[in-house]
Amino acid sequence: RKINDPQVQSERQYQPFRIAQQNINGDEKLVFNVDYLNETKSLTIEQIMAMFLTKLKTIGEMNLNTKVVDCVISVPVYFTDAERRALLDSAQIAGLNCLKLMNESTAVALAYGLYHNNLPDVNEKPHIVAFVDMGYTHLQVSIVAYNKGKLRVMGTNFDNNLGGRDFDRVLMDYFQKDFKERYKIDAYSNSRARLRLRAECEKLKKLMSSNSSVIPLNIECFMN
């Protein structure tokens, strides 16, 4: 995507880091400008994703006590062909051999089918299941028909602008306004403060999900 893409512009409101566009080998790419060791570094999306995959690879090797090379990666159903190819590039940078990119709706459907042995025979009426996936940044819904040894994805839909972070954002906006009125400080004027507020609001959201009592918000060293 380019810097003027509506999806990119929508995403910028959630992120404290600086997003820019840079010509790399004749191709205009999005980069993230980050400060590292007193220098500004420009990192592509592929490079950042490769860092995550490298970390996962390291964790896997430590737990399995063996070298991890092959992998299968699940992706949202709305990923474009370009986004899928970029993810494959990230896997290659991380030293991983991606055997297959699988839609997340298909992955969860397979996982469900593997552990259910009471599915109807092939010539019988299928067992219909709806899967609702509320992720951090998106919502995905899929309807799947099951028979023994067989599944069919009947349909999928998504909203890639609705996720758990939208609940965090409501809490963040509330506390940002409250702090500004009571303490004359603006949490959104400082990137570190904004990140701290986001982290605490996410914790608060999780506590609120399972607790109906009054829950305090505690942030140490907020603006410094």
Functional labels for PLM-detected ranges:
Residues 1-27, 37-51, 58-224:
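Oxyanion-binding/catalytic loops of NTP- or PPi-dependent enzymes
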